[in-house]
Every structure is written in C-alpha cells, then in structure tokens.
Swiss-Prot record:
Full protein name: Large ribosomal subunit protein bL9
One MF annotation (Gene Ontology) recorded for this entry: structural constituent of ribosome
Organism: Listeria monocytogenes serotype 4b (strain CLIP80459)
Similarity-based family: Belongs to the bacterial ribosomal protein bL9 family.
Keyword flag RNA-binding: yes
Keyword Cell division: no
Function statement: Binds to the 23S rRNA.
Gene from which this protein is expressed: rplI
Cellular component terms per the entry's GO annotation: ribonucleoprotein complex; ribosome
Residues annotated as transmembrane: none
InterPro entries with a match to the protein in the record: Ribosomal_bL9, Ribosomal_bL9/RNase_H1_N, Ribosomal_bL9_bac/chp, Ribosomal_bL9_C, Ribosomal_bL9_C_sf, Ribosomal_bL9_N, Ribosomal_bL9_N_sf
UniProt-listed GO biological process terms: translation
Keywords: Ribonucleoprotein, Ribosomal protein, RNA-binding, rRNA-binding
Length: 148
C-alpha cells in the first residue's frame, strides 16, 4: 500500500515522503497512529500544494534576509564605554549590548545569538561583527566603540 508520511518514522520514511509499505503495517500502525495517510489523489495534491507553500515561504525568508543584509552592511553601531590607558575598556561590550543599541538607534531587531562574536569587545575602535541572518546569508555589522 502506498502511504504519505505525516511524521518521521525511523527506518521507514521522513515527513512528506511517499512510500510503498505492507498493507498490515500501513493500516494497523502507520495510519492508526497518525504517522501516515493513504496515498490517493486528494492526499497527493494536498502534499504538492503544501510543498509549494513551504518553498514559497523559504524563498520569501531568503529574500527578506538578503534585503536586511544590504541594509546592515551600510550601518555603523555607535557604542560608548568608559576606558582606561591605551584604549582598554573597563568591562566589555557584549553581543547583547550591540543588539540593544541596533534596535534602539536603527529599529532593527536581531537576536543576540545570531551575532558571531567569539569574545566580548574590550578595546576602543571599529570592530566587524558577523551576523547570521539566514543559513545562506551572513551580514557584517560595523561596531564603533568610542570613549564615554
């Protein structure tokens, strides 16, 4: 019997796949427990419509991320901090502070975990911070730390 998997089933199939399985297995386990539905014309057309919708959403997300990247590449985030001799900061600038300042000054809300800052900024000056907007799109944000 041909079935369309609604959920991942270990060793049998992934969500959205159409496979041929034994009739008893399909009726008594997969369909009964909601892991799959019988692959008839209506179910197949629903599956193809759902895949088109998911592809469209993914394309929109990618386009949105690319537009945000263009906007962010031209921005400079200005932060002020107290510093001592030689431009060393008292404390440090974290990705959380950068995200808050970016939202406050430019109105762009970015999750602090998307900023690839291996360690906090501890010196005055310009720093390039990579920001992962999408699994295919990474923007570089210019952060300028000046003396308070």
């Amino acid at each position: 019997m041909k079935v369309i998997f609604l959920k991942d089933v270990k060793g049998k199939g992934k969500k959205g796949e159409t496979k041929n399985v034994a009739d008893g297995y399909a009726n008594n386990f997969l369909i009964k427990n909601g892991y799959a539905v019988e692959a008839n014309n209506a179910a197949l057309s629903t599956l193809s419509a759902q895949k088109k919708k998911e592809d469209k959403l993914a394309a929109e997300e990618l386009a949105e991320a690319k537009a945000l990247k263009e906007k962010m590449e031209n921005l400079t985030v200005e932060l002020k901090a107290k510093s001592g001799e030689g431009g060393r900061l008292f404390g440090s600038i974290t990705s959380k502070q950068i995200a808050q300042t970016l939202e406050k000054t430019h109105g762009i809300k970015i999750d602090k975990r998307k900023m690839d800052l291996p360690e906090a900024i501890r010196a005055l000056g310009h720093t390039k911070v990579p920001v992962k907007l999408h699994h295919e799109v990474t923007a570089t944000l210019d952060v300028h730390v000046s003396e308070e």
